[in-house]
């Protein structure tokens, strides 16, 4: 990388041949590592954004113009080398106002590329112009940050990128397997309970009484029903053994024909 932040064509060819891009003996890629391409013509702003990204454990490549960014991505000519298909860039963060090529023009170039159109692009600007923000978002920008960029902004971008990297590297492929394993662990459903109409005879209620004898009249019912004496046996013995009878008792026992 040049001192001004650019990547020369010679340096890019060395990275391709030695192992920086598409090398044979390159280090294994960490799934949690996020590679960010930072583009800004201001040296101070470029240093600030690079430090913020490194604080959040991001791998940073910083360049000073949109043309340098296209060179690094292999989009500076119509025939891009096949080696750049292996280039891993998870995020591109670029300034809006730059000489030669603005951040909006760089955004359009990236979205027109078949290799990097899915890479999220974040635009930075020190001017809060709504028309500029809307135009970048409509073109496909992931976010629009106002300078000076804060550490909270970078952490928010970092958290979203980490989730996307993990999801694209395994979670989507594991979803069908997990669902099948859950279904296989469940017991088979029991057959539905059916009641056959022939299993038991239908319940019928007879309207005829079980007793075939004719109904009794009220007089017969009264005469045939046993009368319970309200006087106990002991009281009866006392009454019969008494030599004197009360007038009420004698009056009841006296026959009306004898009077």
UniProtKB/Swiss-Prot annotation:
GO cellular component: cytoplasm; nucleus
Gene Ontology molecular-function annotations: phosphorelay response regulator activity; protein serine/threonine kinase activity
Modification type 4-aspartylphosphate: residues: 95
GO biological process: circadian rhythm; cytokinin-activated signaling pathway; embryo development ending in seed dormancy; protein autophosphorylation; red or far-red light signaling pathway; regulation of DNA-templated transcription; response to cytokinin; response to red light
Keyword Phosphoprotein: yes
Tissues in which the protein is found: Predominantly expressed in roots, and stems of young inflorescences.
Transmembrane intervals: none
UniProt cross-references to InterPro entries, sorted A to Z: ARR-like, CheY-like_superfamily, Sig_transdc_resp-reg_receiver
A Pfam family it matches: Response_reg
Compositional bias ranges of the Low complexity kind: 195-220
Region feature (Disordered): 165-259
PTM annotation: Two-component system major event consists of a His-to-Asp phosphorelay between a sensor histidine kinase (HK) and a response regulator (RR). In plants, the His-to-Asp phosphorelay involves an additional intermediate named Histidine-containing phosphotransfer protein (HPt). This multistep phosphorelay consists of a His-Asp-His-Asp sequential transfer of a phosphate group between first a His and an Asp of the HK protein, followed by the transfer to a conserved His of the HPt protein and finally the transfer to an Asp in the receiver domain of the RR protein.
Residue span(s) of domain Response regulatory: 35-162
Compartments in which it is found: Nucleus
Highest taxon, organism lineage: Eukaryota
Principal location: nucleus
Keyword set, alphabetical order: Cytokinin signaling pathway, Nucleus, Phosphoprotein, Transcription, Transcription regulation, Two-component regulatory system
Induction: By low temperature, dehydration, abscisic acid (ABA), cytokinins (BA and zeatin), nitrate and high salinity. Induced by trans-zeatin.
Assigned protein family: Belongs to the ARR family. Type-A subfamily.
Self-association state and partner proteins as the record states: Interacts with the phytochrome B photoreceptor. Binds to AHP1. Interacts with DEGP9.
Function, as annotated: Functions as a response regulator involved in His-to-Asp phosphorelay signal transduction system. Phosphorylation of the Asp residue in the receiver domain activates the ability of the protein to promote the transcription of target genes. Type-A response regulators seem to act as negative regulators of the cytokinin signaling. Modulates red light signaling through its interaction with the phytochrome B photoreceptor.
Name the record gives this protein: Two-component response regulator ARR4
Lineage start: Eukaryota, Viridiplantae, Streptophyta, Embryophyta, Tracheophyta
């Amino acid at each position: 990388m040049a001192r001004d932040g650019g990547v020369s064509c010679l340096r890019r060819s060395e990275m391709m041949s030695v192992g920086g891009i598409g090398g044979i003996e390159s280090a294994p890629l960490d799934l949690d590592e996020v590679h960010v391409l930072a583009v800004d013509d201001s040296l101070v702003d470029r240093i600030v954004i690079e430090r913020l990204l490194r604080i959040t454990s991001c791998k940073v490549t910083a360049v000073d113009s949109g043309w340098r960014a296209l060179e690094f991505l292999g989009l500076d000519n119509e025939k891009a080398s096949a080696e750049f298909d292996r280039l891993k860039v998870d995020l591109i963060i670029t300034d809006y106002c730059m000489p030669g090529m603005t951040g909006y023009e760089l955004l359009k170039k990236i979205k027109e590329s078949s290799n990097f159109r899915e890479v999220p692009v974040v635009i930075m600007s020190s001017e809060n112009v709504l028309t500029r923000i809307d135009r970048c978002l409509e073109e496909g920008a992931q976010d629009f940050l106002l300078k000076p960029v804060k550490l909270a902004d970078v952490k928010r971008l970092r958290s979203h990128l980490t989730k996307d990297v993990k999801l694209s590297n395994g979670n989507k492929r594991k979803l069908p397997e997990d669902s099948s394993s859950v279904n296989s662990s469940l017991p088979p459903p029991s057959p539905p309970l059916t009641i056959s109409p022939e299993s038991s005879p239908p319940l019928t209620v007879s309207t005829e009484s079980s007793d075939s004898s004719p109904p009794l009249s009220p007089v017969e019912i009264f005469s045939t029903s046993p009368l319970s004496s309200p006087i106990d046996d002991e009281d009866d013995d006392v009454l019969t053994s008494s030599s004197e009878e009360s007038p009420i008792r004698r009056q009841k026992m006296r026959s009306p024909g004898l009077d």
